[in-house]
């Protein structure tokens, strides 16, 4: 196993390019619970270029019917990134003030995590994000309504 550095600029460039449109290589989950985590996974993939194909616990996308739950599910992505010690990206939970470009923010309503955002900039220290479902381009985190936000710092990825 070797470490792959996360290409933050590639993740940000992807997010900025596709924030208000859909990459035809991926299914649009807007009509099936939301596309935010699918979009965030695409951005992370752009930054690491490696998937984890373990059937029940991995992070991958081949098609709408052949994908890991972690690719498009908010809580599943969170669990995968924070617990992965194998192939694919991995993350640590940090404070919002320690976020970097290409990192993720997940919003919680007090009961569950329900939305995933990609950090694409900062304004006076406040994260600016891109997201799908409620499509957003360089939107300030301050404009969202949530009980609390969890910051996921993408450390890198593992690969064979």
Model regions: which residues?
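N-terminal capping segments
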Residues: 1-72
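...with weaker cross-activation on analogous glycine-rich loops/strands in unrelated enzymes
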Residues: 61-132
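General "foldedness" signal
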Residues: 25, 29, 54, 91, ...
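Glycine-rich, aromatic-bearing surface loops/beta-hairpins
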Residues: 119-120, 124-160
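Residue-level signal for the start and early helices of compact helical domains
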Residues: 20, 68, 90, 143-145
């Amino acid at each position: 196993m070797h470490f792959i550095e996360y290409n933050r600029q590639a993740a940000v460039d992807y997010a900025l390019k596709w924030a208000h449109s859909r990459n035809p290589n991926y299914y649009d989950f807007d009509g099936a619970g939301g596309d935010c985590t699918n979009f965030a996974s695409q951005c992370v993939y752009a930054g690491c270029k490696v998937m984890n194909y373990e059937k029940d616990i991995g992070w991958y996308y081949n098609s709408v019917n052949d994908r890991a739950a972690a690719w498009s599910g908010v809580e599943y992505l969170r669990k995968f990134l924070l617990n992965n010690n194998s192939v694919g990206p991995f993350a640590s939970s940090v404070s919002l003030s320690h976020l970097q470009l290409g990192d993720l923010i997940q919003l919680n309503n007090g009961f569950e995590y329900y939305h995933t955002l990609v950090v694409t900039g900062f304004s006076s220290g406040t994260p600016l994000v891109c997201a799908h479902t409620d499509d957003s381009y360089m939107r300030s985190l301050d404009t969202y309504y949530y009980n609390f936000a969890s910051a996921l710092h993408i450390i890198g990825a593992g690969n064979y």
